[in-house]
Amino acid sequence: MNVKVFRVSGYFEKNGRKFKFTKEYRALKEEHVKELVYSDIGSKHKVKRRKIFIKEIKEIRPEEAEDIVVRRLSLEL
């Protein structure tokens, strides 16, 4: 199995305001990335899943990753 790097962008609503986000994750499938986004944003910002809106999930090359931890973990292999 090959671990891929994904960039996720979207927004979430909290107290009537919208907050944009862009995150990068390593995962096997897009479905795993969705769960990671819901879990991560939901726990950090105390937001329900129905208030998190994912606009785009895009597979990127490890060299394109802006998150230094994701990039280093991907390029070590």
Swiss-Prot record:
The keyword rRNA-binding applies. GO terms for biological process: translation. Pfam families: Ribosomal_L18A. One of its GO terms (cellular component) is ribonucleoprotein complex. It comes from the Archaea. The lineage of its organism: Archaea, Methanobacteriati, Methanobacteriota, Thermococci, Thermococcales. The keyword Nuclease does not apply. The gene is rpl18a. Part of the 50S ribosomal subunit. Binds 23S rRNA. This is Large ribosomal subunit protein eL20. Belongs to the eukaryotic ribosomal protein eL20 family. GO terms for molecular function: large ribosomal subunit rRNA binding; structural constituent of ribosome. Keywords: Ribonucleoprotein, Ribosomal protein, RNA-binding, rRNA-binding.
